[in-house]
């Protein structure tokens, strides 16, 4: 019922979660549970590829929020990747490419009016580099992106620093807080396509 994060990173995540109003996450879990208890949040969008895990977590959230007068609206965005239960959302080896690409495209599938209200995004699922790169064209300049396991995997994810600035991190050296670089209009499509099938 807690996010799977390093201790100081967890504190940093809670700091931004407490200030948000509409929260979007790639990869559900303890972060979703904690967010569902936050009265400041109006809406949660959660992308998940493990249906059994999603259903188990949804039941925990329903039980945990019983009796609360104000809770966020939770919208599940389920993507079929042939994932085995408890395998961190890993796509099956026979999963079609279009389904893998669909995972990182979920924020773009929301209505413009919905996207514009999002002020906090957590990247903590699969296809992380592509998910972060695809967010760029849709989010407001003041939207915050929190990217877990970034600093210990910069060889996988470092490309995002061509388009985002790190505005905060902790000595745990994993989670980073990102905002869009102010002088960039869009990310070239060929850069995004290069990372769409990178499942890490």
What is the predicted function of each stretch?
Residues 1-13, 92-99, 184-200:
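N-terminal donor/sugar-recognition subdomains of glycan-related enzymes
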Residues 2-4, 22-25, 124-125, 156-157:
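A short linear-motif detector with a strong N-terminal bias
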Residues 4-87:
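SAM cofactor-binding core of SAM-dependent methyltransferases
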Residues 14, 54, 58, 104, ...:
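Generic detector of well-ordered alpha-helical segments enriched in charged/polar residues
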Residues 44-46, 64-66, 95-99, 141-143, ...:
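Short, low-complexity, polar/charged sequence segments that are solvent-exposed and flexible
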Residues 71, 79-99, 144, 150-161, ...:
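Glycosyltransferase catalytic domains, chiefly GT-A lineage
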Residues 74-134:
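Internal catalytic-core helix/loop-beta-alpha segment
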Residues 110-200:
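C-terminal substrate-binding/active-site "lid" region of AdoMet-derived donor-dependent transferases
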